[in-house]
Amino acid sequence: MAGSTIELRGLRREFPSGEATVVALQDLDLTIEPGEMVAIMGASGSGKSTLMNILGCLDRPTSGSYRIAGRETSSLEADELSALRREHFGFIFQRYHLLPALSALGNVEIPAIYAGQPGEARRARAGELLARLGLADRSGHRPNQLSGGQQQRVSIARALMNGADVILADEPTGALDQRSGTEVLQILDELNRDGKTVIIVTHDASVAARAKRVIELRDGVVVADRLTSPEAARRAGDAPTRQPPATPRWNWRREYDRISEATRIAVLAMAAHRLRSFLTMLGIIIGIASVVFVVAVGDAAKRKVLADISSLGTNTIEIFPGKDMGDVRSSKIKTLVAADARALAQQPYIDGVTPTVSTTSTLRYGGLEANALVNGVGDQYFDVKGTKLASGRFFDASGLRDIVQDVVIDEKTRQTFFADVAGGAVGKVILIGKVPCRIVGVMQQQQSGFGSNQNLSVYLPYTTVQARFLGNSSLRSILLKVSDTVATADAEQDVTRFLTLRHRVKDFVILNTDDIRKTITSTTGTLTLMIAAIAVISLVVGGIGVMNIMLVSVSERVGEIGVRMAVGARRSDILQQFLIEAVVVCLIGGGLGVGVAFGLAALFNLVVPMFPLSLSGTSIAAAFVCSTGIGIVFGYLPARQASFLDPLAALSRD
């Protein structure tokens, strides 16, 4: 079976024109053997261009049969026709149809990209073809830097890139001067001598005279089919035959090359419309920056809240007199006493216990005085609260027993009374009300939060405060540290049962810091989610902007799509091309959005140093995942529209 024989039998092509039908080709019977050089002539409207489009698998006949290498084309799917165009045919167009964003070398490479040739081999062959056609020194030039003749030679090199054995030339000299036209025809002669089947569509008799066989059309009918040289009859069929290739199997390297090329084209397309690309990205930039920044603020707020809660102590519960929080009669309930604390200390689920009492008084030292909160606490208070000392020591159990007048002061008190005192505060005697107390320790500074306030605070043994300041034995509260092996909720239930039995009535209320932590963490998370959801709206708006611009890009690049399909791009290749472009736009926008979020976080940290923000790797990774997802979701419709364009219609609109 002749691998390259072209056979037309009863071929007919009709086009609708309003309510009428225009017949472009009528019942053509035609055979073109391998190695022939054929000119198809005819006046405008004779059907010669329609015939060439059908021969090149850019169009389908209305009826009849078109067989290439014995294979009926009417039954082939779109991708199978793409494979024929990619490997079997080479197109030379009157208007060149070179992609303006690519160099001469890049234009020649295009068919090989879709054929899956490796990058190095592809570039080497493209360079060889350009050198063969006298364009070695112009391989890096773009089409607008080349003359018409040079552009047509680039088009010829592109047609030869995949080793096509049928060259279809549509008015190859129509846009050239005489000299350039002659050079192009000489190249076609050489290709024919090399065994290529060359089919030239022309209305110029002098061009047709270069062919060995001339087919003349009139009103869609062959009116003449003659040989111009006896040699042509002998040479026809002598060319090596070749079976049309099957669609290549999937190969990861070929796919990588295609994706790399699509990414490069995407960047070039963006560079060609910088302002439009930036405005397209703006919605993505704002959306990603908002989401990442809001998540960072939410995380920082959560950390701050948890740190403030920790100032109440870790895994702690606190017992207050009263039937519930806010009980107005709680001050009259005197049943919460130190004996309760000692009894609770014996329970296995408790790691530490401290009674607490409090009052206010005036501090005096060296002519200075200030009001302060006087806290009476147990010797385990500082461990339960996780408090650390800047200097000195805490008082111990013997101090409670002996009702010592030792005091631990906070950092605010030190700054107020002892900032300029030589030797510091430890060891000095400060007057609290009328009671002289020796300073034994200074606490580290604590951030303001749940466990602190702006008042000065001092800490004495609770027995001392009861005896010297209050004159009674009741407690303000009992603070418990729950064992790490016990859930605070379980401990709370056990303490409730224990004290209820001990008091014979529930005259106390328990504050569980773990409940506070959970509530505030949940609230913070909800607020963060709500604000992030608002920020996501801008992402959706940005995605719609990407879709709109991609639709505009498709409409502007219809000609490019037609060229890519003509040289063998499958629908999936076109879909992939525009999807990748949408994803690249969104990824760059996402990267810029993350950069903006970093800038906002840095500015925020300068303005509010007590509330530091840090961007998490998770939120950044999520930002890029969102960017990719937006590109795919909102880029799919334009990409699909591009992939379903008819190659002939796309070329005609260029």
Curated annotation (Swiss-Prot):
InterPro entries: AAA+_ATPase, ABC3_permease_C, ABC_transporter-like_ATP-bd, ABC_transporter-like_CS, MacB-like_ATP-bd, MacB_PCD, Macrolide_Exporter_MacB, P-loop_NTPase. GO terms for molecular function: ATP binding; ATP hydrolysis activity; transmembrane transporter activity. Keywords: Antibiotic resistance, ATP-binding, Cell inner membrane, Cell membrane, Membrane, Nucleotide-binding, Translocase, Transmembrane, Transmembrane helix, Transport. ATP binds at G42, A43, S44, G45, S46, G47, K48, S49. GO terms for cellular component: plasma membrane. Its main location: membrane. It is an enzyme of class 7 (translocase). It is found in: Cell inner membrane. One of its GO terms (biological process) is response to antibiotic. Its EC number is 7.6.2.-. It is a multi-pass membrane protein. It holds the Pfam family ABC_tran. The chain crosses the membrane at residues 278-298, 527-547, 584-604, 619-639. Residues 6-244 form the ABC transporter domain. PANTHER family: MACROLIDE EXPORT ATP-BINDING_PERMEASE PROTEIN MACB, MEMBRANE COMPONENT OF TRANSPORTER-RELATED. Homodimer. Belongs to the ABC transporter superfamily. Macrolide exporter (TC 3.A.1.122) family. Non-canonical ABC transporter that contains transmembrane domains (TMD), which form a pore in the inner membrane, and an ATP-binding domain (NBD), which is responsible for energy generation. Confers resistance against macrolides. This is Macrolide export ATP-binding/permease protein MacB. It comes from Rhodopseudomonas palustris (strain HaA2). The gene is macB.
